[in-house]
Amino acid sequence: MILNKIKVVVAGFRGKMGSTAVQMILNAPNFELVALLGRKEEVSEAFDVPVFNRKEELENIEADVWLDLTAPEVAYENTYFALEHGLRPVVGTTGFTEDEVARLIKFSREKELGGLIAPNFALGAVLLMQFSKQAVKYFPDVEIIELHHDGKKDAPSGTAVKTAELMAEERLAHHQGAVDEKESLVGARGAVLEGMRIHSVRLPGLVAHQEVIFGSKGEGLTLRHDSYDRSSFMTGIALGIRKVMTVSELKYGLEHFLDL
C-alpha cells in the first residue's frame, strides 16, 4: 500500500483529454481521484467518486491538486478558485492572457502554493520549444505552423504562443520578409507575435502538431512535433501533479519541471 497518495480533483473530465487523464489517475498507484467537476447527467457509474456541477460545491473537498482540462472561458476563474481554496492547480487549458498568468503567479506566491499552467503536456513538444529557442539564435528568420483538430476553440495554440515567446528571449531584433510586402487577402501571412508569423490549421483527424520553420541563405531547418493521440500528454500531466507538490508558486510551462 502506498501512503500519502496525492488527492486529485479533475475539472473537465468529460472531454477527450479529461477522460484520458481520469483513467491515468485511476491507474496510477500514487494518485487518488477524489472528485470530478462536470455535468452529473453525463456521468458513468464506473466513477466511484462524487461529481459536482459547480466549482463552489468543492469548497470543502479534501484534495491536493486541481487538474483543469476545461475551456478557455472558465480556466482563469477555476485556477484562481483552486488557489483560493488551498488546491494546487495543474492546468492544461490554453487561452490565458499574459496579465492573467501574472496575476495567478502573484496569487500563488501569496498563498505559498505550487501550480502549473502548461501550454502543452507532451514532453516532445516541450523539447521542441527549447530546441527552437536555441536555433533562433542562429536562424532569426522563422515562422510557426500549428495544426490541431477542428474542435479546438482558441487560435493560435498556447504552444505556438509559448514557442514564440521563448524564441523572442533569444532572437535579435530583426525585420523578416519584404519591406514592402502586401497581403492581397487579409490574414494570408498569418498572425504576428514578437515579430514572428504564426499560422493556425484546424482540420478533422488531427490531434496536436507543430512545425517551426527556420530559413537562411542556402539552407533551412524544420523542427516538428506530433501528438498522434492524447496518451502523449499523460506523462507530462503526471509529472506536473507530482512536481506542484514540491514548489511554492505557480509555474508557466512544463519546462520548469524538466532537467533542461
UniProtKB/Swiss-Prot annotation:
Q: Give the superkingdom in one word.
A: Bacteria
Q: Which PROSITE patterns match?
A: DAPB
NCBIfam families to which the protein is assigned, alphabetical: dapB (TIGR00036)
Would you identify the family this protein belongs to, as annotated?
Belongs to the DapB family.
Task: Give the organism, scientific name.
Answer: Lactococcus lactis subsp. cremoris (strain MG1363)
- According to its UniProt record, which residues of this chain constitute the active site? H148, K152
Against PANTHER family, the record matches this protein to: 4-HYDROXY-TETRAHYDRODIPICOLINATE REDUCTASE 1, CHLOROPLASTIC-RELATED, DIHYDRODIPICOLINATE REDUCTASE
The major lineage groups are: Bacteria, Bacillati, Bacillota, Bacilli, Lactobacillales
The EC number of this protein is: 1.17.1.8
Q: Where in the cell is it found?
A: Cytoplasm
| InterPro entries for the chain | DapB_C, DapB_N, DapB_N_CS, DHDPR_bac, NAD(P)-bd_dom_sf
Q: One cellular component GO annotation, for this chain's record?
A: cytosol
Q: What is its main location?
A: cytoplasm
Protein's job: Catalyzes the conversion of 4-hydroxy-tetrahydrodipicolinate (HTPA) to tetrahydrodipicolinate.
| Database matches in Pfam families | DapB_C (PF05173), DapB_N (PF01113)
Q: What is this protein called?
A: 4-hydroxy-tetrahydrodipicolinate reductase
Quote the HAMAP family the UniProt record gives: DapB
- Positions with a binding annotation for (S)-2,3,4,5-tetrahydrodipicolinate: H149, G158, T159
